[in-house]
């Protein structure tokens, strides 16, 4: 068959044109039933959306953890137990584009050992379709904000299952509730160790709640992080699920607004008052954020530090905006890369 290539992935599929995708099709009624699709086959994009809880992601690989989705792993492979499997739908080729494999590769992940390639339990082929992917994308309006998040930041859309999963994970890890299974205890300890490195909280809440939300936001922004491992390691608690959960959206909104103000501070650096190095303390988050900027003066770092201090006093932007309005008007935006950089700066330790 013809080699199918594209500039980017679309939920483990490739977009051939504005309406058509090429995607692997798994002939597996058992898997279809688990995903509530009511068909004899499953598109890889549907499986990707179910596992991640999001759509419109630029990914061609999928990791599935046994602790949460052992039934899906069994339906795909016939394996009775493992830690996780990985599916690779294609590869990057010389011209920078992506090629769809004729048959996706399936691997058993074995800790530090070399992954072992597996055979598919059922037939897999390639289909071209304009069938819409999983629907029920959430389009709720975010809380009132001084700045509007651009569409480029919201290109990855979450399904209700993402919000439901995050709601119980946020509660379980944030409150250390009902954590008995070894897998869950291990991920809790791993998160707790990394959470202690956080420099600034982006939302009111405890250290673990902030860490979990930050990982979920980084995942939706397409950045590397722990969210896939977290969501694959904490079993569902239906009684704690809520599709109305929005704490991560509030955090993303807060992070974007701070990044906007930080960018404005740098743009208008000549309008800032001169400061004496010996008299000022600079927040490490500000230092990390401005590392990629050329010659950010001390006045920029001090002003950004003050913004962080004012924001974290009440977790709103009223005082911070009043403060910077003495020197300039905020007239810039922030990119996805800016927001990711700020998230990572907030999570970074010494």
UniProtKB/Swiss-Prot annotation:
Pfam families (alphabetical): Herpes_U59
Stored InterPro entries: Herpes_U59/UL88 (IPR007616)
Domain of life according to the entry: Viruses
Family recorded in the similarity comment: Belongs to the herpesviridae U59/UL88 family.
Protein name per its UniProtKB record: Protein U59
Organism: Human herpesvirus 6A (strain Uganda-1102)
Gene (UniProt): U59
